[in-house]
Amino acid sequence: YGFELISVPMTPNGPDMDIVEKLVAEDDTIKGIWCVPQYSNPDGYTYSDETIDRMAKMKTAAPDFKIFWDEAYIVHHLTEEIIETPVLLNESKKYGTENRVFMFTSTSKITFPGAGVSAIACSVDSMKYICKRFSVMIISYDKMNQLRHVRFLKNKEGVLAHMAKHRRRLVPCFDAVKTAFNEELTPCGDIAHWTNPKGGYFISLYVMPGCAKRVAALCKEAGLTLTGAG
């Protein structure tokens, strides 16, 4: 689509904000940043309160800079601990930057992939902008599907109860992978390390430089398909 992606190193608290702040403050051709703030792929990191605050108040050279805030895993907990982060839209209002925020979520990893419902949160001005463009994309949404989701999930408590069922099925899978890593790789020394996420759908395995693609190929030969290795 004619735009360039700039990668920023990740930390356990989110993207390296020193780098983010420097980039967006100095270059007015940088128009936005895409973030998955909770259980972010591939490491399962959750942005800290400080990171979210810095996102909300950072100075940007581009007056039309946007933050695309993808809450893909907002309720995808793998432990009994319910991690909640500050709402970026609320934080941005403290600094008068709410027009830069677009927050997204959906039920694609809750009910039906590709056939769930989605939601957008943004400022009033931004919502007017979006609705004007949505009006030429679709005449009417799938109201029956929306109704099915409301009747099934009902409310926040219903969503969390449903996700607890997902967790009971997923946790044994995560445990099996981590057990295999500990039993097979730990005795070999520093050849690999891996993440222990509290939520999301991924465990990241880090192997020695130059080995990732070969490891993925061997896994595929053994019948285990992994997310593309780099």
Model feature map: region roles:
Residues 1-3:
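Substrate-binding/gating loop at the entrance of the active-site cleft, primarily
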Residues 7, 34-37, 68-71, 105, ...:
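Short beta-strand segments
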Residues 12-83:
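Active-site phosphate-binding strand-loop segment of PLP-dependent enzymes
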Residues 13, 38-41, 73-75, 108-111, ...:
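Short, solvent-exposed loop/turn segments at secondary-structure junctions
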Residues 90-171, 184:
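Conserved core segment of the aminotransferase class I/II
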Residues 127, 131-132, 137, 202-230:
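Conserved C-terminal alpha-helix-loop-beta "cap" of PLP-dependent enzymes
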Residues 164-178, 190-206:
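Conserved glycine-rich beta-strand-loop-beta hairpin in the small C-terminal domain of fold type I
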